[in-house]
């Protein structure tokens, strides 16, 4: 007799810290064993069901959608989806259960089954070891609701009493008139994952494996067993019943029906006609002189394709969100592939004029691609929440939710969880964590383990590392996407379960952005960008002090002084070109116009670097190499001197040279992005080569293009993205060049953001001769502000007054009370300040320690004394200042002030710490950053500086880039991999770092190639100088 079986009760690793295998592993194993179907029944979640659906499609083995859940004060049950109605019912049930509980938990109540949900089949999993009456009552309760849609699940796992258990379960089923079926309670695809499953169980229960006891399964039988093994335990009729149930479950995720909201369309209009009307209004605003024939044709082409694909409502929704932001004076800008669209530009979603660029609309939408477009919009990072709450208000929480992100285990974190439950002591776990790389999930080598004092051959360490390797990449929990929104015409809970986010007033769906693409749900990304906050604040400050109202659209273009500043790499604080790698490239590329900035933004990226495109481009730009490309491809290559730098160029080459359709070219782009992870690029090699040879191109050229495509890997940068970012790059550079005080002030008020700390931004401003005034309770507001100066140079006639936000641990509400009280009359002493601003002891002491009372009372020692006196008299206050005996206190030393500044403000307006150490350093023949400007190439020397940044790009072959700061400027240090590994503790842990190395000076770019590192942090005597690491 041919045995058949379908597993109806199986958990994937999306039953967090329970399931020990991925959906792909489960489906591949079930297919190998000859199963007829596989149900994925993760506990009260559908978070992994799209991945299971993909695994089902790739293997051809049918997927049954389901979920296991414990009913509060009731039975344990597995619900299986029979049809569309059942799927919607399951989504709603999970949503209700998750929404009524805390993050990561659920509560299913009996009332959730009143009335019984249609379209769901139920497997009852009775607890024979518990209360017999309660078990029987639970079965009766389920039978009353599910009737002929209920089965009793029989799980047998080589227990000592399996025969008796089978008899008891069958008797229970018969007594209630409920059919029985075999089910495996599967937690892993293979027996070999038992150790990992035990480990995850201990992690989940916050115990050790040794102490977990009955929490662990008795054996490894909860895996996908071969049919022969199953037949040893189950009668054939119990196995066959599983297949009959599976055949009833016909639902497929591909059948989901999704509609975008329609309420934005006025009466008498359709979504298509209304989108056209809004687009035409935008055309008149954007192009007051009228459209060129080419642009008109592009607009018509886009509108026709949008209507054909039924994306009109999506565009209307994004337009509505952008219009709300603008109505609230929230700066925003669309980016990414949407910048390829003339319609998006007309609607005000993007700011990139398609007439001034050569962008490819098919990168955004194509007829052949059966996927929705993806529009990303950046908003001011500290006002994005206003936009998010507007969306919730507009559509209701039932129809709008944020996308999830499946947070996964990484190297060190996975090891910590594993080692803890295997009983390693905390000090060993911490030491072992040091041996893990910060930059990859790879396990440490035996050599590295020995370096940190571990014997790689000890059994416990082998076990920890083996289990860690299995756990890396597993989902750990669902978290919230930075801003991906799904909005629906119908309640979202009919499409996907919705649960509470960790943040208040937010809900998330249980799928991530890749899941949404696969099932065809439209998403709009509401993203946060700190630079937009800084630009808007700069515009406001300039308007306040100059009377000039700038916008992104009205800033003067192609400004010579701005490009000269950029070419000097004087770009601290600006957008995108402020990193160490970008600043090293700027003097070599020397941008002169906007498109040069587009290339600059894109060229210092993994794709062009790995594709060996950077140096050929620079050589051609500098006249060191001939610019060559086939004449037929001039429209593709002329703007990048024959070197492909962008995804769109690869697509255009495929279309023009190899006869790809636009949709096929987009498939090439996707294969290019995924080939390193999933393969799939090789079929395009022959297709490209054959097409290009047929059209008269040289074989060498075809091969070179393909190798460059491979080099792009998953890092090919879209030109539309680079162009959108370049707009903000230019705006930030122009403002830094022409309004440096306002720009720096706005950056600090917008912090945290960007690459540099407020201290580094202020030091840069001082090097540019901007006057910085201290925090002073007599003048400072919460934010930093500008104060006029009598200076003939427009770029230097505004001083920055530091705000009370700079004082560590000081609260904004205290600052606002100071502003209100001060507006009535000036403060006269500490008592007056404390009384009228209603400051408690903590707030008053923070002001005194920071020096903010210097102008009102005197130096820090004096201020702290008077504040302490005010606190002693506080019970006697009667609204009148008190008189105190004057006490003479010593002035703080320069060093004491410096330490206090960094401790309380994170910066200093006094001498730079290195200035105080310069004599000591000079005695040891240390060079300063200023000295390096005049020294010849290949000189060996030592420097010392505060570490303000460490970077280790993924494309740098393990090289770490360190930026040091002294009183004159910055020193860029290159630390090769072997030195970084040998001196990792010094490299990562030093605040004041000495570097001995070789100076490399070429084309205006200077680096120090490190040969030895020394930690000089003790010389700082308590300064807390924080670097911005590994950005």
Swiss-Prot record:
Enzyme class (EC, first level): transferase
Source superkingdom: Bacteria
The EC number(s) this enzyme carries: 2.7.7.7
Membrane-crossing segments per the record: none
Entry-linked CDD domains: DnaE_OBF (cd04485), PHP_PolIIIA_DnaE2 (cd07434)
Subcellular location: Cytoplasm
GO biological process, one term: DNA replication
Role played: DNA polymerase involved in damage-induced mutagenesis and translesion synthesis (TLS). It is not the major replicative DNA polymerase.
PANTHER family per record: DNA POLYMERASE III SUBUNIT ALPHA (PTHR32294), ERROR-PRONE DNA POLYMERASE (PTHR32294:SF4)
Family according to the record: Belongs to the DNA polymerase type-C family. DnaE2 subfamily.
Listed name of the protein: Error-prone DNA polymerase
